[in-house]
Amino acid sequence: MPVTDSIADYITRIRNAGNASNKTTDIPYSRLKENLSRLLVEKGYIKSYTVITSEQFPFIRIDLKYTDSGKPAIKEITRVSKPGRRTYEGKDLKKYLGGLGLFILSTSRGVLTDKEAREQGIGGEVLFRIL
């Protein structure tokens, strides 16, 4: 079955795997999803990711991160810009929850967090927010 919103599929798979206490989850590969995974590793929301090329199709295996009490490191992950209603922000992007969480943006300079976009003075499409 074709997926119309691959970013929503990406964050839903991560959220569901975390809620089910799975150690890993597999996501169909795209360069954007690989860049998102790299960013989530840098910010400490997931342990690691591996791109696996199989005979049928490539995918990304994400190793999820949990707290000492066994709760997922990702408390909340929500899609902001959707196919039916795109959401763009300029260089004056506000902090998410006063800086506790992050907005992830797709910009002309690649996938960035809200803090990085403010520092570089650029805006972009707000893909999702994460806490």
From Swiss-Prot:
Gene3D superfamilies: 3.30.1370.30, 3.30.1490.10. One of its GO terms (cellular component) is ribosome. One of its GO terms (biological process) is translation. Keywords: Ribonucleoprotein, Ribosomal protein, RNA-binding, rRNA-binding. It holds the Pfam family Ribosomal_S8. InterPro entries: Ribosomal_uS8, Ribosomal_uS8_CS, Ribosomal_uS8_sf. One of its GO terms (molecular function) is structural constituent of ribosome. PANTHER family: 40S RIBOSOMAL PROTEIN S15A. Belongs to the universal ribosomal protein uS8 family. One of the primary rRNA binding proteins, it binds directly to 16S rRNA central domain where it helps coordinate assembly of the platform of the 30S subunit. Part of the 30S ribosomal subunit. Contacts proteins S5 and S12. This is Small ribosomal subunit protein uS8. The gene is rpsH.
